[in-house]
Amino acid sequence: YEIQKNRVSATGVLAKDDPYILRAAAEAASEIESARIQLIEGISRIHDKIAAGGEPTLQERSNQRRNQVRCAWRAVSALDEIFARSGGGAIRKSSPMQRHWRDAHVGLQHMIHTEGAVFHANSLHNLGLETPQGMIVVV
């Protein structure tokens, strides 16, 4: 919010007075907060189970991995919605927006955020089907 507060669009409207930018900012904030809550809640649940001497089931691990990946992609999609409304100056190397956008997208390229295998394995679990041994590594 701080970066956008005093920005003026090409049409001369302050970002703080543009209802479309404000709507996108509120929606993005909600998506990021929702992703954060889902991620922390799931990790806390698994942590508590381990702390109590238990071991998470393959299903619990699979669901948490699915949520972890989805949370990352949701948060970056929310960032994209803000970036798309940040004007041409956002892409300048001197802009913190550019750095945040780049870092978020690079983070999604890490193997841990690869959707395909994680979602595939999770769907097999949820359908009660056997997960091939090679896919268990992504869980």
Regions found by a protein language model. Give the residues of each.
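Generic structural signal for well-ordered, non-transmembrane alpha-helical segments
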Residues: 26-33, 65, 69-76, 102, ...
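Glycine-rich phosphate/cofactor-binding loops in nucleotide/flavin-utilizing enzymes
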Residues: 88-139
